[in-house]
């Protein structure tokens, strides 16, 4: 019997009198086939260490520990720490860290792996309410995570993996795809969780690029310009740029100059621009003094 078997999950929750906290976005997966698919998708073996975020009662952790060299699981809810010590007692390659992943000193923490030189993959069922901050925090850290295989709300997975000229495409797509390739591996129905969430989930597989997708003069400015392009999706790029940078005649002249330099029509909408287009635009706007 697996931790994720519904009867086992229920027995564990009953034994500890555990009640779900909505503020932590707790939804425990009770389908062993899906857990098997997750570790298969992540291609976990003894040559990699794994970071897990939000292990819950250890359903996914159990599968990861069987395959990985070591697992470091970050759990914010201190009530789950003794439960995890119980459910994972047969494994000597799991460390449970009772800490918010966003506040953890990851550089120091990762040195606690027996072999910290092994590649690190992030495999997790992320809390819906904080998926994007966690992902961006990890992606933008200087830690070379090799791969992410993470479950999240289907809508967020669609946005991250979206292509230009689609409804889901936006600044989040650009922010992630600048660093990573991103592809939905499979969809997970809401019915396989306790308690069931209101929406379906998806497993997103993201692999770090050797180099960012494009080279830009100023990364922060590039991300800023890409966000500006989507502030009002139905407005033209020109209107969004003017709203952000200002309506002074000198500013508008510089914007016109930058757009011309980048070879981009002012009348286009942000969703029609590729990451490469936004890169050219950001560099051009920088060049004209914005």
Swiss-Prot record:
Please give an example of a GO cellular component term from this record: cytosol
Binding sites annotated in the UniProt record for S-adenosyl-L-methionine: 27, 29, 54, 75, 100, 125
Q: Give the signal peptide range.
A: none
Keyword Cytoplasm, does the record have it? Answer: yes
Q: Which domain of life is it from?
A: Bacteria
The compartments listed are: Cytoplasm
Major localization class: cytoplasm
**Family membership:** Belongs to the class I-like SAM-binding methyltransferase superfamily. rRNA adenine N(6)-methyltransferase family. RsmA subfamily.
> Can you say what this protein is called?
Ribosomal RNA small subunit methyltransferase A
Which species does this protein come from?
Answer: Streptococcus equi subsp. zooepidemicus (strain MGCS10565)
């Amino acid at each position: 019997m697996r931790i994720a078997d519904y009867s086992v999950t229920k027995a564990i929750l009953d034994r500890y009198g555990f009640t779900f906290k909505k503020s932590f976005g707790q939804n425990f997966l009770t389908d062993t086939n899906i857990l098997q698919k997750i570790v298969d998708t992540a291609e976990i073996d003894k040559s990699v260490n794994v970071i897990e975020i939000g292990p819950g009662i250890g359903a996914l952790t159990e599968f990861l520990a069987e395959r990985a060299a070591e697992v470091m699981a970050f759990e914010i809810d201190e009530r789950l720490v003794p439960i995890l010590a119980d459910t994972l007692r047969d494994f000597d390659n799991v460390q449970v860290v009772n800490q918010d992943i966003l506040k953890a000193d990851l550089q120091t923490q990762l040195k606690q792996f027996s072999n910290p030189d092994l590649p690190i993959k992030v495999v997790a069922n992320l809390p819906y309410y904080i998926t994007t901050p966690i992902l961006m925090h990890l992606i933008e850290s200087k830690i070379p995570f090799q791969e992410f295989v993470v479950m999240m709300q289907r809508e967020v997975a669609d946005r991250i993996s979206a292509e230009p000229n689609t409804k889901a495409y936006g600044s989040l797509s650009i922010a992630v795809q600048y660093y990573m390739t991103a592809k939905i591996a499979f969809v997970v129905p809401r019915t396989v969780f306790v308690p069931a969430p209101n929406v379906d989930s998806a497993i997103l597989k993201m692999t770090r690029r050797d180099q960012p997708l494009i080279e830009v003069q100023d990364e922060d400015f590039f991300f800023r310009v890409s966000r500006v392009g989507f502030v009002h999706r139905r407005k033209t790029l020109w209107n969004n740029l003017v709203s952000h940078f200002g309506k002074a005649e000198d500013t508008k002249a510089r914007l016109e100059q930058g757009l011309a330099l980048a070879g981009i029509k002012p009348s286009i909408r942000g969703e029609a621009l590729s990451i490469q287009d936004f890169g050219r635009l950001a560099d051009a706007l920088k060049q004209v003094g914005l």
